[in-house]
Amino acid sequence: MLAVAFPHNQVQILPYNRTVKDLGGLGPVDFLEAIRERFEMEAGPAVPRARGDIAMYFQGAWHTVRPRIGTDRSDPIGSLDVSVLQEQLLAPVLKIADIRTDKRIDFVGGARGIAELERLVDSGKAAVAFSLYPVSVSDLMDVSDTGAIMPPKSTWFEPKLRDGLLIHVI
């Protein structure tokens, strides 16, 4: 086990983005229609501007999607963008019920950047990519204060620690 403690002002949390290999049996038009039923959608930047915005890369273009149904900000887990994406898009639209076991979803750590998401979609290795606003240290602490754990693949911490055997010569 590797454990470390950092002051909250010395750790950076980057987004843990997602790519999905296929559209769950939907064609492109039906996929976009299903998105528009649940989200406001407009052309937008590759990096979300604020919490609540999810950037989606599909067919060579970036879109900003925002849920039509508001999130309960008093729910520290349910209000996270990763939870909103899972509950309102990945599960109902793309039929990805469990991101831990579904082979159609991959995760791209924030350090790899937006260009990696575009490369994966443009090369055909993924059908769609989602760029998320990073979880804040405050969000992380709020979840911890409830005794809960963060959703899988919701945080990418920097600096990364090298793990392995450490030897100190005396």
PLM segments and residue spans:
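Surface-exposed, charge/polar-rich loops and edge strands
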Residues: 1-170
